[in-house]
Amino acid sequence: MDEILEEELEKKESEEFEERIVEIRRTAKVTKGGKTLSFRVLAVVGNRKGKVGVGVGKAREVPEAIRKAIAAARASVVEIPLYKTTIPHEVFGRQDASKVLLRPAAPGTGIIAGSTVRAVVELAGVQNVLTKCLGSTASVNLALATLNGLKDLVSPEKAAKLRDITPAQVLYGARKEA
């Protein structure tokens, strides 16, 4: 049993993930003796093939905070369905007061997004997407809202079955008959 768990862990670690630090923020705790400084780091990891994770690390030293953030991001990796170079359908992600709208885009559009949302969708492997951030623009909440939206994605076949339409109608919209 332990051998299987070790093999699974090695397999997960050996999988090549690209890492990106989105934000490094210095925080101060004011005490009677003065200010205690620490750092908070937001990191995103992904393999550009449909797997992405977001993590936050806090420590008194920047390198330690970065290490913790990357470890947290690797632990939170989720798999998302991609359709060619975009997402299969429109989706809305929420985290606290932050909201992110993600819409599929035609090839050649690129990633139309702010820096935090861009980091998450780029490392997920999406190449063409339109996004809009609504509400709070706090980096951590935006990254988590984007991840929540990506988690809500379903494959075109599954979406079509749920809505009782064809997969083509999910991807290209329902055609009106004259």
Swiss-Prot record:
SUPFAM superfamilies: dsRNA-binding domain-like, Ribosomal protein S5 domain 2-like
Annotated keywords: Ribonucleoprotein, Ribosomal protein, RNA-binding, rRNA-binding
Chain ranges of the S5 DRBM domain: 17-80
GO molecular function, one term: rRNA binding
Entry's Gene Ontology cellular component terms: small ribosomal subunit
InterPro entries attached to this UniProt entry: Ribosomal_Su5_D2-typ_SF (IPR020568), Ribosomal_uS5 (IPR000851), Ribosomal_uS5_bac-type (IPR005712), Ribosomal_uS5_C (IPR005324), Ribosomal_uS5_N (IPR013810), Ribosomal_uS5_N_CS (IPR018192), Ribsml_uS5_D2-typ_fold_subgr (IPR014721)
UniProt record, GO biological process: translation
Domain of life: Bacteria
Free-text comment about domains: The N-terminal domain interacts with the head of the 30S subunit; the C-terminal domain interacts with the body and contacts protein S4. The interaction surface between S4 and S5 is involved in control of translational fidelity.
NCBIfam families in the cross-refs: rpsE_bact
Task of the protein: With S4 and S12 plays an important role in translational accuracy. Located at the back of the 30S subunit body where it stabilizes the conformation of the head with respect to the body.
Subunit structure of this chain's protein: Part of the 30S ribosomal subunit. Contacts proteins S4 and S8.
Family statement: Belongs to the universal ribosomal protein uS5 family.
UniProt-recorded name of the protein: Small ribosomal subunit protein uS5
Organism whose genome encodes this protein: Pseudothermotoga lettingae (strain ATCC BAA-301 / DSM 14385 / NBRC 107922 / TMO) (Thermotoga lettingae)
